[in-house]
Amino acid sequence: GLDWQRAKWGGFATKYLQFGEEVAAKCADEIIVLSKNVQQYFKDKYNRDTRFIPNGIDKMPMQDADIIKQNWGLEKDNYILFLGRIVPEKGILYLIKAFKNTKTDKKLVIAGGSSDTTEFMNEIEREAGDDDRIIFTGFIQGKTLEELYSNAYIYVLPSDLEGMPISLLEAMSYGNCCVVSSIPECTEVVQDKAVVFEQYKQILKNT
């Protein structure tokens, strides 16, 4: 995605990043983009051709639910997984609010470290409240990461802004059922191989 669109930037920082983008668009020898949507953006706004090089991943092995069962009581197909950075544009607040309105015995696992403010993390935890179905694992890697992907019932990515999400590519490589927001950076990855829901901001705009 375009960095200046991220919610964490204030007005001055946003303008500064937009200025940097314009300079790069006009002066760079080559521009590499991760998504076709951003490629079209540079063409439309700056009449600038770019080179599209998508992200790639290594195929990881399937794992039984050992570490995740010991740490959080997770078993095969008994949880819904979000995995990514804990930042506003990932749509985690929407996800928690929607999940709390469901009547399910599935757990919601929110896995990942925060690169945003402590205040935002506290807001998410307050929203989760005393719903003991919601589990925060913090940053994970290695075999624990592989176990979470291998045993998830559903992988969900409700983002408002993405580049080309590595976690979505990884989830698809494990054969997970994926549920994603309708932003182009997600839909061009999943094509017709996932459940796509209307982006929350678009829903608000249409109401």
What feature does the model see in each segment?
Residues 13-30:
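Membrane-proximal helix-turn-helix segments that form the acceptor-binding/catalytic region
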